[in-house]
Each structure stands twice: as C-alpha cells, then as structure tokens.
Amino acid sequence: MHVNGKVALVTGAAQGIGKAFTEALLLHGAKVALVDWNLETGVKCKAALDEQFEPQKTLFIQCDVADQKQLRDTFRKVVDHFGRLDILVNNAGVNNEKNWEQTLQINLVSVISGTYLGLDYMSKQNGGEGGIIINISSIAGLMPVAQQPVYCASKHGIIGFTRSAAMAANLMKSGVRLNVICPGFVKTPILESIEKEENMGQYIEYTDQIKAMMKFYGILDPSAIANGLINLIEDDALNGAIMKITASKGIHFQDYDLFPSFSKAP
C-alpha cells in the first residue's frame, strides 16, 4: 500500500513515538487523525504540524482510549471528517505497575477494541476498501521482564492477539493486514516513568537495573520506529509480521514456526 493519499488514525499521537508516526505519515502524503487524551499537548502538536503541513491534512481528537464510547465516537468522527480510513496505528500505551488494571486497559484492551473498530470500517466484508492495522507492542512482549510484569504481559497480549487476528482477517478475505512493531528502548516520556514510585510501585527498587539494561541495549530515536512503520505499510506481503527494532540490529523480524494456511471451505 502506498501511503500517499491515504487516511491514517494514530492513537497516542501527540508526543513520543506517536508524534514521529504522524510526522512520517504526513511526509509520505497521508492525512492523519491525531488521537490523544492530553488536550494541551494535542493542540500544541496540531499547531506545530500546521506550520509544516497544510492544516486540512490533520485532525486532532481528544480521546481516552480506555473509554469504549469515546473510542467508538473517535473512529466515527475520523471517517465522517476524512470520508474513509486506510491506516490504523494503535500506539497509545502507559507504564504503570502500581495501577496495573489501568495498564491492561490502555495497553491491551484498547488495542483490541481499536483493532475491531478499524476492521469494522476497513474490512471489505463491511463495504470498506481494505487497509492495514499496526499495533505497537515492545521487545518486552517477546521476553520476561522482572521489573515490569504487567507491562510485559500487556505487550505479550498484543502480539498474540494481532497474529491471531491477522490469520482471521486473511481467512475472511477482509483486505486488511495486521502487523506488530516491537521497539526496544525509545527516547520518549514513558522512559521517565521508571523513576516514579507512582508508576513502578514495589518495583521502584529495581530502577538501577532497568537503567543498566537501557545502557546495554541502547536507546532509539522515535524516528527509527517511524521508518519501520512506513516499511510495514508499504510491503503488502506482510501480514501477521512481528517487526523488532533495536539500537544494535535496527529493523528485523521475529521468526515463528509456520502454521498451516487454512482457507475458507468452498
């Protein structure tokens, strides 16, 4: 799929990786709906983008992705405004081991909800024109992390759900591809949360160990993750792919044993 001329919806779009995604999509000719819970940051992001791109290329919508009604209304507003939806990036996420239920709600449940909403609008079965959904997990979704067990569980869940949903979308001939990006450590505000007790709870004593891991693995710039996003969108052969992006290896993919390719019975 070529990005130029397409309509994208990005959650958690006002800062960090989400902002980098938005900028990359705009640079490649897409129109982008910026979805974020932070009104002030979202308005500032939209204003900054308006100085570089035509204002009509972007739409900012304040939304708490954990609120199902707000999320449904957001998708409707985007399609009403731009007339279509081609690219969905479920990027919003938090790191909070203390309020672990909220972490699961934002990191996993909202991704599942967003994916199903995206399929409702994009699937050819529903009169859509197909498209692509990219869910943002983490390297923590592929390994155990003693200091962040709930965050780790949420990111594992994204991978299992997306791979399964990708198989289902293919069986249903929906015309929608689903893929995952698993970044390593990225220079974003979420990294600052590892030093806050209100985020880490009982695991705050392991902050130095996390910092040592960051030093060992290196820290990526958000633009590196945005490059991976564009690659996933433009490679039509990728469905159910797990793209890993690390400072040491750059973009590479997780290998899995192949499952049988079941097709619908005639």
UniProtKB/Swiss-Prot annotation:
List, alphabetically, the CDD domains matched. Answer: ADH_SDR_c_like
Residues holding NAD(+): 12-20, 36-37, 63-65, 91, 151-155, 186-188
| Keywords carried by this UniProt record | Cytoplasm, Fatty acid metabolism, Lipid metabolism, NAD, Oxidoreductase, Prostaglandin metabolism, Tumor suppressor
- Keyword NAD: yes or no? yes
For this protein, what is any one GO molecular function term?
Answer: identical protein binding
Q: Which reaction does it catalyse?
A: prostaglandin E2 + NAD(+) = 15-oxoprostaglandin E2 + NADH + H(+); (15S)-hydroxy-(5Z,8Z,11Z,13E)-eicosatetraenoate + NAD(+) = 15-oxo-(5Z,8Z,11Z,13E)-eicosatetraenoate + NADH + H(+); (11R)-hydroxy-(5Z,8Z,12E,14Z)-eicosatetraenoate + NAD(+) = 11-oxo-(5Z,8Z,12E,14Z)-eicosatetraenoate + NADH + H(+); lipoxin A4 + NAD(+) = 15-oxo-(5S,6R)-dihydroxy-(7E,9E,11Z,13E)-eicosatetraenoate + NADH + H(+)
Instruction: List where in the cell it is found.
Output: Cytoplasm
Instruction: Indicate whether Disulfide bond appears among the record's keywords.
Output: no
So where does substrate get bound? Answer: 138, 148
* A Pfam family per the record: adh_short
First-tier enzyme category under EC? oxidoreductase
Q: How does it assemble?
A: Homodimer.
- PANTHER family membership: 15-HYDROXYPROSTAGLANDIN DEHYDROGENASE [NAD(+)] (PTHR44229:SF4)
**Official protein name in the record:** 15-hydroxyprostaglandin dehydrogenase [NAD(+)]
